[in-house]
From Swiss-Prot:
Job description of the protein: Catalyzes the deamination of various vicinal amino-alcohols to oxo compounds. Allows this organism to utilize ethanolamine as the sole source of nitrogen and carbon in the presence of external vitamin B12.
Molecular function terms from GO: cobalamin binding; ethanolamine ammonia-lyase activity
Family under the similarity heading: Belongs to the EutC family.
Reactions listed under catalytic activity: ethanolamine = acetaldehyde + NH4(+)
Cofactor(s) needed for function: adenosylcob(III)alamin
Assembly, per entry: The basic unit is a heterodimer which dimerizes to form tetramers. The heterotetramers trimerize; 6 large subunits form a core ring with 6 small subunits projecting outwards.
Enzyme class: lyase
Annotated organism of origin: Pseudomonas syringae pv. tomato (strain ATCC BAA-871 / DC3000)
Main location: other
This protein's name: Ethanolamine ammonia-lyase small subunit
Keywords in alphabetical order: Bacterial microcompartment, Cobalamin, Cobalt, Lyase
InterPro entries in the record: EutC, EutC_C, EutC_N
Entry's Gene Ontology BP terms: amino acid metabolic process; ethanolamine catabolic process
Amino acid sequence: MSDQPMNEVQDNAAPANPWLELRRLTPARIALGRTGTSLPTCAQLDFQAAHAQARDAVHLAFDHAAISAQLAEKGRETILLHSAAADRDSYLQRPDLGRRLNDESAQTLRDYAAAHPGGLDLAVVVADGLSALAVHRHAVPFLTRLEEQASAEGWTLSPVLMVEQGRVAVADEIGELLGAKMVVILIGERPGLSSPDSLGLYFTYAPKVGLNDAHRNCISNVRLEGLSYAMAAHRLLYLMREACKRQISGVSLKDEAQLNTLESDDSAENSDRKIGNFLLDGPAVPH
């Protein structure tokens, strides 16, 4: 009997794949190889594992208490809200319910707005969306980076408003109830087979109930393997400045931030993920 561990499955029968080197450049499922007319065992097992991770991300419970505790350590107030979707099944089967707050949460915001008149520049919303995993991993690090830059520019931000069973449009109601000039929602994106923890940012100027996607700007794939926290914050602040100047957001407001002037996170946050591609020189990702 072989001494090879059972969990180290090798496909010795799989022929060499000349595209294999391309896998250094992307997490996409390319150059999987073949054995006969089928995928090698390792590729099939990897696919099944990725699919299971994506399913788990959709159904993972939103640990808002842990996020609140982390933000409290940084001196940030949080307010817990809930959409009109009572549970996960309702959320998945009735997308419209996830776009509105329940009555209790709406009243909570009315009371807060009455106690804090004068409005604010940006309402900051965090919602589980379709991947609570993304929010657990990336919301606090991103908010830390955003608030450092926003404070330096003099923007006024709301407490962090955390929404259970929330969808993107719930931010419009929140912004309207608070009288905020702008709103951004950090939300878990639909998991992919190579990205179960992708965080999306959706920004709206003059939020109100009934706006559609054309009124929002999206900054997607915020995670260590995607768009860095620093770049995402840089883009969002650019959109905030331009939105206030032009009083628009969405398809009429293009993201023309000069990202090439931004240091792309030389900190430990991203120091291990810089790569090149076919056209640009750059260090390769180690195997």
